């Protein structure tokens, strides 16, 4: 299954643990969406990132091929947060070559507005740099840093 991952899901340590058989396919953007921190994480003690519709914006991430076993593991980790916190949704992403691909991703059921903390953003940055996302993506995530 083709899965679009973004944010903390891109961290290689986390990805190996949650989807050990994943295969990187390509970088992509989710058009007409942005990142919001609309769920609280007791593990991170801060807001968790989720994609949400937003005209004119885009979210950088990567497309991975994940196995059924990977998907079961990923869903188990998503269930570590309260039930129905995240759901799988089908979205169309754009590859760097401009090709539109239908994929699955996780989106949160929002409950409020929260702020990320530096340690969470550092974890995200490790993933962005590992997969060589463009500077635009890195700058966007830097802009979420607490002031």
Model-assigned labels for residue ranges:
Residues 1-147:
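Glycine-aromatic micro-motifs
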